[in-house]
Amino acid sequence: MLDVNFFDELRIGLATADDIRQWSFGEVKKPETINYRTLKPEKDGLFCEKIFGPTRDWECYCGKYKRVRFKGIICERCGVEVTRAKVRRERMGHIELAAPVTHIWYFKGVPSRLGYLLDLAPKDLEKVIYFAAYMITKVDIDSRHRDLPTLEARIGVEKQQLEDKKNADVETRQRKLEEDLAQLEAEGAKGDARRKVRESAEREMRQIRDRSQRKIDDLDRVFDRFKNMKVQDLEPDELLFRELRDRFGQYFEGGMGAEALQHRLADFDLAAEAESLRETIRSGKGQKKARALKRLKVVSAFLNTRNSPMGMVLDCVPVIPPDLRPMVQLDGGRFATSDLNDLYRRVINRNNRLKRLLDLGAPEIIVNNEKRMLQEAVDALFDNGRRGRPVTGPGNRPLKSLSDMLKGKQGRFRQNLLGKRVDYSGRSVIVVGPQLKLHQCGLPKQMALELFKPFVMKRLVDLNHAQNIKSAKRMVERARPVVWDVLEEVITEHPVLLNRAPTLHRLGIQAFEPQLVEGKAIQIHPLVCTAFNADFDGDQMAVHLPLSAEAQAEARILMLSSNNILSPASGRPLAMPSLDMVTGVFHLSRVSEGAIGEGRFFSSVAEAQMAFDAREIHLQARIQVRLRESTPPAEWAPPADWLPGDPFTLETTFGRCLLNEALPEGYPFINAQLNKKAQAAIVNDLAERYPKIQVAATLDALKSAGFYWATRSGVTVAIEDVVAPPNKAQILDEYEQRAERVEKQFGRGFLSDEERRSELVQIWTEATNKIAEAMEANFPETNPVYTLVNSGAAGNMMQIRQLAGMRGLVSNPKGEIIPRPIKANFREGLTVVEYFISTHGARKGLADTALRTADSGYLTRRLVDVSQDVIVREEDCGTERGILTRIARKGPDGVLVRDRYAETSAYARSLASDAVDAQGEVVVPAGADAGDVVIGQIIEAGIESVRVRSALTCESRMGVCAHCYGRSLATGKLVDVGEAVGIVAAQSIGEPGTQLTMRTFHSGGVAGDDITQGLPRVVELFEARSPKGKAPISEVTGRVKIEETEKTFKVVIVPDDGSEEIAYPVSRRSRLRVREGERVEVGAQLIDGAVDPHEVLRILGPRQVQLHLVDQVQEVYRSQGVSIHDKHIEIIIRQMLKRVNVLESGETTLLPGELVERARFEGENRRVVEIGGQPASARPVLMGITKASLATESWLSAASFQETTRVLTDAAINARSDSLVGLKENVIIGKLIPAGTGISRYRNIRVEPTDEARAAMYSVSGYEDGASVEYGAFGAGSGQAVPLDEFDYRSSGDYR
């Protein structure tokens, strides 16, 4: 087999008949599969052992040779080679066709490649291929020209002969008539009889003349057709064609079916055609030019590659290996078979019948019909259903053809090449393990034993508990006591990977050190639940085992959960205290007024601990404590003689002293009440300042303290804890009266329905807020429900309002607010009507969530596809450029404060230029990493904006460079070379997709003014679609004039430079952003609404459209409170603007109208300019992510994304070569991905094991029988059951 590591690129092309015969190991001549009695393959059939290899290892068909020692011998009796059975997965056969057929991909695809090449309409092409019309394939123009006078004379003579014969015939008839009349007269017949005879004779003479004239006309028609005949003419009239062939057969050739096309392609002059097309492009206009451009693409593809157009017509069909289209016996003795066998059988049957008809010399019409059926059979085999009705199997199910095998989620690409099931894995339900450390997980003993089985067996043999692997295996299966001790030893320091589906971002798979636990559930640490988005209501997780030393090292160093505290999307910690932990820490840091022991002094925390143990002080009592080892809090005012490092006395509580013991040494003492936000801020600060190990230890300490004190805080919720405000009825009365007044005014006709609605909505919104305030004021501090909300542990005030205040206004299915409020709360209970109108919103919410999940998943898939080859390829690209970002703004008091968006824009980037203050002094040099501390320094120096490096300005030819990307948000350090930043970006944008809303907001019930928001808006931006009702932007600088007509406004801009005025018609409903006489700059938005990004690109250029898109995407995410760093969005947008559209090709090899990557365009121009030629010109193009993914240079990546057959057709014609730079291409062919530790600079390092390591190496393979089993490149040996398409082996999916 081919070793994937020995080639660097993969080319696809058209196979000729000779190629197919070369691949083949023999011709399949019979449609038989296996013998019904012996169940062995039939000779020369679809499963023939002679062609495809033996069905049993080292055994021929007739059984003469059985054993490895006969390896390589070909049995002289049955002709089968003695070899391994797995060759049946790789050996191909072929079918020799009795008549050529066209390949349906090239004729039926859109656009039809065959049609473009031959300049034939697809309809005409179909007529020829399916035997409905003849096609002229060759005309001998010279001899026709030479012999034309002779032929004309000959035709003239023939016409004269016809004329003479007609005259003679008419004359004879005339004579006969006269004789008849004379005879009748002699007999004395009546005039009536004589008239009848005369009419009959005249009719006959007329027929003679007509017949003769018709023959002469036919002669003229045949001769005219012959005179004007040219190659590629179609002739649907069979009689006319036969006449032509009989008379002038030596001057032309013609035919029908694929054979005619084959002759045509054989004589096709590509170079001449390309030259004439180039001439058309130079001189032509409009449609003609556009068609010539499209045709030139196809013609030049054949011209510039080794492909021959003859490859589009097949003389023989390849037969794929039998183990890839298996036939297996089911329990009932029936057989299940792959659809391909049925399709191949149809081809073979029709082919054999056609051969027989040809041998018999059957009439042409019968043979042509059989040829047509053969063509249709091959079409169905390649792409069933592409033309006409699909071939169906039992139960009217369309059969799966070769194309269907590749397409879609269940196709070869996505099901088997990009995602495989792996060994050494298990899955189980998860439960919480509060006793675990952050880097640990609890693994059920039985599962661990099964996962680590080979390691345990090897160790048992090493420790002499077992004689050989076989007995060790028996020991493990019987679970002897010694096995558990060995298991304990084997799993120490051997990390396992845990994964929870759906894996939306890289934190969905993390490594943990396993701890053996009883039971059958996996235990996970409570702090990693956020990253996995896991809860314990029945979620399941999968466990995978890294086997090799390298895999274990990577799992431990890169994937261990304690090394993944930060979110890759925002760079802030994800492992935050939540729920009970928040409650516990909140309880610890609280102060109770007048509690036991208030005001006492203690000389140390230990003394306070004694008092607490003796129950002399309350946890939350205010006490004075002398602290020695701590750093005082920032707000503490030190006495005059105090020096840093001295002990100090602080008014605090014993709880806060305990809390500070959980924090690292030297961290300022925290003397405040900590709700969730404050706790998050502390974790955030720790992550910025301390190493990861310390942060993980602190988090564990906080977790333990949180759980311990949450238990002891006694927070419980009873129904009496939901306290409704006592004055609720009075508040409601007041608003009831106001609402009544509005209803009366409406009844009298003072208000329109619209006004009444908005008034009522306003009144009841006020009422709801008033009641919420009263309710909040009414809650006692110590109320458990209030504590839960106040600490941030669970719920929010809106939910409490619904429990204890009033539910307020709800919306109907259309999304409009119903002006009747729900006055009750859940504590009192709703009336039936109130309950009923509540159900609208609830039901819509659930339906929305289901739709959103699917849409969000699809968006993530497209984002991954467009950005998968963006990898950090170099340290520094050396660019001077960057983008200007705002880092601070003036507060209300005129002091600079940090800009609220600095978190997602300037944070974690490298500075592109020095940050210089007003005095011209450098505060921070270029190249520095803008962390929180650096940003603080810059703001202190009074600088408002800085220039930072960005992926948008990076000049790396492939991927991005480390400095332009800046800090890796997941690690907090400068990004490593080899980091797959594109995929991280796609995950960071896609993962919160499910949190975005689906709705289109209705502004005041006006249908036309919907503003698209949420997920659909993000999709609209990334797909670069023109938004509905787009807002125009000014193309010039000038003054505004506004003209009103009945239906529209016209915004007219009078340019400053005196050129022609530009008018923008806008609807009267739109809100104008400009006033009469106002001066506007280029690119100013004229009305409210979404701007078309293509317009921004055209008017303001690529940089502005990049910033516009980043800003617009961020707007959607910010509105939902999701924090994503700009750099992720920039990477996607960089991919959208990677290509240019060639306008003039100059002397380059580029074609006008072609989309090429900017790097290739610049390289080609550089080459042409160096030799003194004329360079090409182009303009930048903004492509949506789907289109950009399909336009990628890598055909493997594009084919595995969407439109598989179209991509492969195109790639094959262009003989495209995939240089394997992205991730998907390498996964597909089974190479290490060129990212992370797979990039070449890491792959070239060899690690030599020490002697101890060599001794301790565990062998993993072949523990079944002690022998080393060689597995081929296609997976396990033939003993394995093959899942068939008929049975739906769906993956278990997400059980949540």
From Swiss-Prot:
<dbReference type="InterPro" id="IPR007083">
    <property type="entry name" value="RNA_pol_Rpb1_4"/>
</dbReference>
<protein>
    <recommendedName>
        <fullName>DNA-directed RNA polymerase subunit beta'</fullName>
        <ecNumber>2.7.7.6</ecNumber>
    </recommendedName>
</protein>
<feature type="binding site">
    <location>
        <position position="75"/>
    </location>
    <ligand>
        <name>Zn(2+) 1</name>
    </ligand>
</feature>
<dbReference type="Pfam" id="PF05000">
    <property type="entry name" value="RNA_pol_Rpb1_4"/>
</dbReference>
<dbReference type="Pfam" id="PF04997">
    <property type="entry name" value="RNA_pol_Rpb1_1"/>
</dbReference>
<keyword id="KW-0804">Transcription</keyword>
<dbReference type="GO" id="GO:0003677">
    <property type="term" value="F:DNA binding"/>
</dbReference>
<feature type="binding site">
    <location>
        <position position="60"/>
    </location>
    <ligand>
        <name>Zn(2+) 1</name>
    </ligand>
</feature>
<keyword id="KW-0862">Zinc</keyword>
<keyword id="KW-0460">Magnesium</keyword>
<dbReference type="Pfam" id="PF04983">
    <property type="entry name" value="RNA_pol_Rpb1_3"/>
</dbReference>
<keyword id="KW-0240">DNA-directed RNA polymerase</keyword>
<keyword id="KW-0548">Nucleotidyltransferase</keyword>
<dbReference type="Pfam" id="PF00623">
    <property type="entry name" value="RNA_pol_Rpb1_2"/>
</dbReference>
<dbReference type="InterPro" id="IPR038120">
    <property type="entry name" value="Rpb1_funnel_sf"/>
</dbReference>
<dbReference type="InterPro" id="IPR000722">
    <property type="entry name" value="RNA_pol_asu"/>
</dbReference>
<dbReference type="InterPro" id="IPR045867">
    <property type="entry name" value="DNA-dir_RpoC_beta_prime"/>
</dbReference>
<feature type="binding site">
    <location>
        <position position="535"/>
    </location>
    <ligand>
        <name>Mg(2+)</name>
    </ligand>
</feature>
<dbReference type="InterPro" id="IPR007080">
    <property type="entry name" value="RNA_pol_Rpb1_1"/>
</dbReference>
<dbReference type="InterPro" id="IPR042102">
    <property type="entry name" value="RNA_pol_Rpb1_3_sf"/>
</dbReference>
<comment type="subunit">
    <text>The RNAP catalytic core consists of 2 alpha, 1 beta, 1 beta' and 1 omega subunit. When a sigma factor is associated with the core the holoenzyme is formed, which can initiate transcription.</text>
</comment>
<dbReference type="GO" id="GO:0000428">
    <property type="term" value="C:DNA-directed RNA polymerase complex"/>
</dbReference>
<keyword id="KW-0808">Transferase</keyword>
<feature type="binding site">
    <location>
        <position position="539"/>
    </location>
    <ligand>
        <name>Mg(2+)</name>
    </ligand>
</feature>
<feature type="region of interest" description="Disordered">
    <location>
        <begin position="188"/>
        <end position="209"/>
    </location>
</feature>
<feature type="binding site">
    <location>
        <position position="877"/>
    </location>
    <ligand>
        <name>Zn(2+) 2</name>
    </ligand>
</feature>
<dbReference type="InterPro" id="IPR007066">
    <property type="entry name" value="RNA_pol_Rpb1_3"/>
</dbReference>
<dbReference type="GO" id="GO:0008270">
    <property type="term" value="F:zinc ion binding"/>
</dbReference>
<feature type="binding site">
    <location>
        <position position="954"/>
    </location>
    <ligand>
        <name>Zn(2+) 2</name>
    </ligand>
</feature>
<dbReference type="GO" id="GO:0006351">
    <property type="term" value="P:DNA-templated transcription"/>
</dbReference>
<feature type="binding site">
    <location>
        <position position="62"/>
    </location>
    <ligand>
        <name>Zn(2+) 1</name>
    </ligand>
</feature>
<dbReference type="InterPro" id="IPR006592">
    <property type="entry name" value="RNA_pol_N"/>
</dbReference>
<dbReference type="InterPro" id="IPR012754">
    <property type="entry name" value="DNA-dir_RpoC_beta_prime_bact"/>
</dbReference>
<comment type="similarity">
    <text>Belongs to the RNA polymerase beta' chain family.</text>
</comment>
<dbReference type="InterPro" id="IPR044893">
    <property type="entry name" value="RNA_pol_Rpb1_clamp_domain"/>
</dbReference>
<dbReference type="GO" id="GO:0003899">
    <property type="term" value="F:DNA-directed RNA polymerase activity"/>
</dbReference>
<dbReference type="Pfam" id="PF04998">
    <property type="entry name" value="RNA_pol_Rpb1_5"/>
</dbReference>
<keyword id="KW-0479">Metal-binding</keyword>
<feature type="binding site">
    <location>
        <position position="78"/>
    </location>
    <ligand>
        <name>Zn(2+) 1</name>
    </ligand>
</feature>
<dbReference type="InterPro" id="IPR007081">
    <property type="entry name" value="RNA_pol_Rpb1_5"/>
</dbReference>
<feature type="binding site">
    <location>
        <position position="964"/>
    </location>
    <ligand>
        <name>Zn(2+) 2</name>
    </ligand>
</feature>
<feature type="binding site">
    <location>
        <position position="537"/>
    </location>
    <ligand>
        <name>Mg(2+)</name>
    </ligand>
</feature>
